[in-house]
Amino acid sequence: MSAPIPLHQPQSQQSASQQSASQAQPHPAQPHPAQGRPASPPQPSSPHAPHAAAPQPSAPPVPQQRTAQPSRQHRSDVVIVGAGVAGLTAARHLIAAGVSVTVLEAADRIGGRMATFDHHGFRLDHGAHLLNTSFPDLGDTLDLPRLELRALAPDVLVHRRGREYQVGAPSGPRPALTIGRAPIGSPWDRARLGAALARLAATPTAKLLARPELTSARALAERGIPARTLDGFVRPLLVALLGDPALGTSSRVADLALRGYARGRLCLPANGVSAVPLQLAESLPAGTVRLGVSVRSVSADGVDTERHGRFGCRAMVVATDARRAGELLPGLHQPDYHPVTTYYHAAGESPRPEPQLLLDADSRSPLSHALVLSEVDPSYAPGGAALIASTVLGRRDFGPDGPRALEPLVRRRLGQLYGVDSGGWEFLTVRHLPDALPAMPPPHHFRRPVRVLRGLYVCGDHRETSSAQGALASGHRAATAVLQDLGVIRASAAPELAA
């Protein structure tokens, strides 16, 4: 089991097209603390499901006014369309400054892609999420002790060409990296890698952004990293961190991601990633967020909805995913996406008795990485069972049966990687997210404008970096722009970048 992380908290008038503001995904609703009462995490309800059925929600309390009722006219200082992490972050900062806010969400739950569902007592995140203690906005925006972050092991387990080895630090954040039992180069190569990561951890952002910008793959090839070190550790680690199997991501983004890895610890909340949006929502006044409200069009002075009338405002923020934002704000930059497919299996006992990220460095394998979530925190699985999450990256032709068709191959590969008989494991479900991560090829604009025009704003990870840090930072930037234009605060310096 992973121990809690002892962390400190840092200081810290145009109409658009007639589309829905946020994609209502066919997934179970989560309790909505911003609308009446605190949410409770999913509770175990039964033994393992015998088949790969769709996850069912635990029975949440029904908050007061959980779903908006039809009405004709509403008004607040700011209307935010989308109750994902970016939108909730913007709402939190605006309300803290004394501005009245209404958040409209088309779905029946908050959180967007950062969702956790109960499946017969197993906590399944909506996709493979990893947080990092080095994310600056994580500590600036959230109450970290209440988030109950659980750290992954400081080292990673790598499989390549039939061999297994560990690479990592023995404890704590990485002032330097030590490597044991790892056939990734000579002792000199391993020392160079540890020194390089230590230097990277101390490198200022401005210096990283001054480097020539290439694709990650090309930059790695040109930096003189020994092939065994590159293929045996750096490449598979970056693939897992970026969700990009071809490493076409900007080399500057890759440098920031590696720096974050060297500085901090990969981690997850004890109650699943939905704990992040739930905590954000809990900080908002009751009634701030209205679920089940589909938006037809937006302008700087209001939002027109399908069934709930018009919401007037002095400023309007679109905080949906990039596709929906582009429908509401024609002409907005539209990124490509990296798909992420996550398979969930249950086992009677853990195949790895520690919360260690497993990297599959075999180019012929369908897998990128895997993690025993029940070792991160036992509450991820009921009754002492083990929960294993494994990730397949990239676009694939799964055939007429979809991602389930790949499950037998994934399970066999997991057995090989963990050195166990996985034939008796239960397949719980698979989550396929074709638009999981906005792509960040070079040249990548780290801070796309959040101000469309005075009174009209946009935020989301597609305006920053494709991570929880990007969503949090983008929401903060949008709120700052609104407050500046409303005359509440003066312009301030931009915070430090992180991937």
Language model: regions and residue ranges:
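N-terminal Rossmann-like FAD-binding beta1-loop-alpha1 element of flavoenzymes
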Residues: 73-103
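Helical element adjacent to the flavin cofactor pocket in flavoenzyme catalytic cores
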Residues: 253-307, 311-315
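Mid-domain catalytic core of redox enzymes
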Residues: 2-6, 37, 296-404, 417, ...
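Glycine-rich FAD pyrophosphate-binding loop
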Residues: 95-119
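Conserved flavin/dinucleotide-binding core of flavoenzymes
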Residues: 3-8, 12, 63-71, 379-499
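Extreme N-terminal leader/targeting segments of oxidoreductases
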Residues: 1-78, 96-97, 489
